[in-house]
Amino acid sequence: VVRYDYKGIEGLQLSANYNFGQRHNDKGRALTPGLKNAFGFGALYTAGDLDARFAYGHTNLETNATYKHRVDGFLASLGYKFGDFKLTGDFGYAHVKFDDAKTNKFYVSPGFAYQVTPASQVYGNYLYERVKGEADKDKTHGFLLGADYKLHKQVVLFVEGKYVTT
């Protein structure tokens, strides 16, 4: 991987990367399918209580045939903090092409976090996801609610519950 980060403007970070081919994971096991190459770029902007992020990625996967297998996707996230209460919104889209088959994926996930004490917070979000292939269309709705407690700067206990329907 080759990566470049630009941090010349206060509150703004721009990043770009190129991933070379990879046929094995970190433990030496074969990846199926292998990574032919990939690139991505993103931007993070923070000003006061506002946090905005955007990323785009393109991945070419290896095939042993003449057709292509690729994945394109983007992610956008926006968050704003009102004292101890934070609202967030995540949005994503992916397009997968495998030979002549195409699949489009979309999700939106608004959420919140409330800092109850300096060591504890409650958080939750809603998820709507749609996956549309050549012949099928699936929708998912989900809710997540959780709480955490920070015992130490590197130790956090948490409990979460979720409900998902398709």
Model-derived features: positions:
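Short loop/turn motifs that connect adjacent beta-strands in outer-membrane beta-barrel proteins
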Residues: 10-11, 119, 154
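Detector for outer-membrane/organellar transmembrane beta-barrel domains
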Residues: 33-144, 149-150, 162-163
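Outer-membrane beta-barrel biogenesis signature
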Residues: 1, 151-158, 166
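Surface-exposed coil loops of outer-membrane beta-barrel proteins
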Residues: 1-39
